[in-house]
Structures are given as structure tokens and as C-alpha cells.
Amino acid sequence: MILITYTKPLSKLIGHFEKFPGIGPRTAQRLALFILKQPESTIRDFSEALLEAHSNVGRCKKCFNLTSEDECEICKNTQRNQKLICVVAETKDLLALERAREFKGVYHVIGGLISPMDSVGPELLEIRSLVERVSKSEIDEIILALTPSVEGDTTSLYIGKLLAPFTKVTRIAYGLPMGSELEYVDEVTLARALEGRTNLN
């Protein structure tokens, strides 16, 4: 078997792309070769965009969605139902639900799922801030939109018990296999999942 050898700078670039989620060696090579074909001005604009995003994008102080301001556009939108909160694990899940165009409330991004195997406990997630947010506001319903997995179920049950004294807690219905990621679910399935949510109280 002949091993492919790259010049050191190219090998380094490919190595960086391979660190991206979902990017294998072949895709990393394709991306690196594409980058090398671009004019220097394009590469400079790209690198500046990366640095700007890394420096200026942070978390919304209210829901922990990604934003470049104190509050994200969704939280600031007065047309959204502020009394209806959908809890998601990551911003990518929020974006998936927004693509479905079914949910008209606001969100709370907890930043992951409870996973003892990975040493991720409730204290490492934005669960306490969620409880504080709900306890200090008039919330009609909390919708848990967490991945259908052991970790997702554990997190949903944990949050459900904490929030039950304050408001109605539901979980979206799933028409997908255990372990499926929300970001890969089509818009129609997500819309139906929201409509068919079940009560956890």
C-alpha cells in the first residue's frame, strides 16, 4: 500500500480540517486543495471572518443562544411568545426548529446533555439558569426538545422534575429512531413532533 505524502504546510491544513465534526480525511483533503486554489484576497477575507466570529460571537444572557449582542434576535423579538420556552441542547437544535417554522415561542440552550459517562453533570449545563428564568417569570409551558437518547431522556426527566412546580412541562414527540440528532431531522417531522408533544407533569 502506497501512503500519500503531502508537503508540510498542506498536511497541516488538512489536519486542521480533519478536526471538524463530520469531516473525514478525503473531505479534509478536498477542502484544503480548494482553499489553495483561491486568490489571496479571498483567503484573507475568510481568515478575518473566522477571527471576527470567534471574537465577537458569544452567548445571549437570557437564553444562551449564539449572538453578537447582549440578547439574541429571538429573545428581542416582541412578536414571539415569551411565555412559551423550548429547551434545546445546542444552538444547532434551535436552528433546526427554526427551519421548521412551527415554533413561535423563545428558547433556552442548555449547552449539552447530562452524561455521567462523559463526566457531564447538571452543574455544567445551563439548567440552574433555566429554573431561575422560569421561577421569576409567568411561563405557560416549557417544551423539552432534546435528542431521543439515554442522555436526552435523563436530561428531560431531570429538568421536568425541577420545573414541574412552576409550570406545564411537555416533551416533543419523535417519529425517528433512538439516538437521532435534531439537526438532521426534516422540517415536516419536527413540525409534527412539536404538535404531538406529550405532558411530563
Curated annotation (Swiss-Prot):
One of its GO terms (molecular function) is DNA binding. Keywords: DNA damage, DNA recombination, DNA repair, Metal-binding, Zinc, Zinc-finger. InterPro entries: DNA_Rcmb_RecR (IPR000093), Rcmb_RecR (IPR023627), Rcmb_RecR_Znf (IPR015967), TOPRIM_dom (IPR006171), TOPRIM_RecR (IPR034137). GO terms for biological process: DNA recombination; DNA repair. The keyword DNA damage applies. A zinc finger (C4-type) spans 60-75. SMART domains: TOPRIM. Residues 83-177 form the Toprim domain. Pfam families: RecR_C, RecR_HhH, RecR_ZnF, Toprim_4. May play a role in DNA repair. It seems to be involved in an RecBC-independent recombinational process of DNA repair. It may act with RecF and RecO. Belongs to the RecR family. This is Recombination protein RecR. The gene is recR.
